[in-house]
Design a protein with these regions (language model features):
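Exposed aromatic-hydrophobic patches
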Residues: 10-13, 44-48, 368-377
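Extended beta-strand solenoid/passenger and fiber regions
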Residues: 1-38, 45-47, 62-77
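Surface-exposed, short loops/turns at beta-strand junctions within beta-sandwich domains
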Residues: 49-54, 377-381
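Solvent-exposed, conformationally flexible loop/turn segments
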Residues: 5-10, 53, 363-369
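Short, well-structured beta-strand segments within conserved domains
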Residues: 24, 55-62, 384-389
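Short, exposed beta-strand/loop patches in secreted or surface proteins that constitute
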Residues: 2-3, 31-38, 79-83, 132-133, ...
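Beta-propeller and closely related beta-pinwheel folds
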Residues: 71-235, 264-270
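Beta-sheet repeat architectures centered on beta-propellers
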Residues: 176-180, 186-190, 196-413
Length: 413
């Protein structure tokens, strides 16, 4: 669009060496009396056809096919919708030839378009590769491996006094960023990324402040440290499962789940997910071999075998405070639906051999609440753990409490 002044007969396009000028309109009506210089990118009007003075009253449409310029957009590997109250623009990044560039679309005839990317709609952000962009309310957070920026839609005024939307970029944090490409999550309206010190929640994204990212992964700090030391961050992914209030952190060493409603961590073995997707009622995950799986609470078999459910305590001294003790017995109280078998195993330590294992059965006809009790032979240890497992396909039990009896030189309890 151009604003005619009533006297100018030559208007310069935004590009040179265009393929053709398709049409020219004045006040919305297609007009004649013009010629195009496609080599120099200009349109000239004959006397009597010069556009009258007006605001955005002249429209010139031209085309220029450029495979190289198309690839600037089509080689981008990630993107998001953002801009205004209804996210009217597409923001793209991840072009390996332009690793620190952000490209964004423009409205076409006042409507959102995923096909119209003006040549000037880009931002160069720092000097490092962009790893992710996520939205928090009206802010767009932009990450590299060691820095964070933010952007938002800002109305600005041009030389003629016209308002136009702009998306400036501001510094947010010079120490922390996102190490996993394309895997930042938004947990309970708070962005989450993996940084050099662990998983971080971005609690304040309005101004630059080194305290706006807070690490919350201390309970799995040893695993995170090993991931960073071995360069395995690229093999991890983060996913927020809003329906259950859980954050999934998939690593080469297991799937760690943070229940942010209960502030608890737990781990699943044997899951090497590289991507998650939830369809209402079912969570799917893709492994690095391209196989698709889903989680189910109804299935009792997996790969033609009965699923073993188990729970284990942390390695603990059970209050012995570093002194050697004997683990005399373990008692497990369960609330049974239809009877079950439980195997209770006591280990002297996390990597030691099984010292004592006992399988006990409960018939529902006997009692709805039953205590499983067995003595152990673990003696003179400084730490131990207990594992409770069940391989029944159609029986279950809710564990209500576990009681340990220990003895050392000072006390028996």
């Amino acid at each position: 669009q151009f604003s005619g002044d009533g006297t100018s007969s030559v208007y310069t396009l935004g590009e040179k060496e265009v393929d053709s000028v398709l049409w020219v309109k004045t006040d919305g009506v297609e007009t004649e009396g013009w010629t195009a210089d496609t080599q120099n990118g200009t349109v000239s009007f004959a006397q009597g056809s010069i556009p009258q003075k007006g605001l955005n009253n002249l429209e010139i449409c031209w085309e220029k096919a450029s495979t190289a310029k198309e690839r600037i957009i089509t080689k981008c590997t990630a993107g998001m919708n953002f801009g205004g109250n209804t996210d009217t623009r597409v923001f793209l990044y991840g072009n390996p030839d332009y690793p620190n560039y952000r490209f964004y679309s423009e409205l076409a005839n006042g409507l959102p378009s995923a096909e119209y990317f003006p040549e000037t709609n880009y931002t160069v952000i720092g000097s490092s590769t962009l790893t992710d962009m996520v939205q928090q309310y009206d802010r767009q957070l932009i990450f590299t491996e060691d820095r964070a920026y933010y952007s938002y839609c800002e109305l600005r005024t041009d030389a003629l006094g016209n308002y136009y939307p702009s998306f400036p970029v501001y510094n947010l944090n010079f120490e922390k960023g996102n190490l996993i490409k394309g895997c930042a999550a938004v947990m309970d309206n708070t962005p989450v990324t993996l940084s050099d010190d662990g998983l971080n929640r971005w609690i304040s994204t309005t101004v630059q402040d080194e305290r706006n990212a807070v690490c919350f992964s201390a309970p799995i700090s040893h695993t995170v440290k090993h991931i960073l030391e071995t360069g395995n961050a690229k093999n991890c992914c983060i996913y927020d499962r809003q329906s259950t209030g859980e954050l999934y952190f998939s690593t080469p060493y297991g799937l760690y789940i943070y229940n942010y409603k209960a502030n608890l961590w737990y781990r699943y073995d044997g899951i090497d997910a590289v991507q998650f997707c939830e369809i209402p009622g079912r969570l799917y995950w893709l492994n690095k071999e391209g196989k698709l799986y889903y989680f189910s609470e109804e299935l009792t078999q997996d790969e033609n075998g009965v699923i073993t459910a188990y729970w284990c305590t942390p390695v603990s001294n059970f209050g012995a405070k570093g002194k050697k003790f004997d683990l005399l017995s373990v008692a497990v109280d369960t609330d049974n639906d239809n009877g079950t078998d439980l195997t209770v195993t006591a280990n002297p330590n996390e990597i030691g051999q099984i010292m004592n294992s006992q399988t006990v059965s409960v018939d529902r006809n006997n009692s709805l609440l039953r205590r499983f009790f067995f003595k152990t032979e673990i003696k003179r240890v400084t730490a131990a753990k207990v594992i409770i497992s069940s391989t029944h396909e159609n029986r279950q039990a809710d564990i209500k409490s576990i009681t340990f009896k220990i003895k050392n030189k000072e006390v028996e309890r």
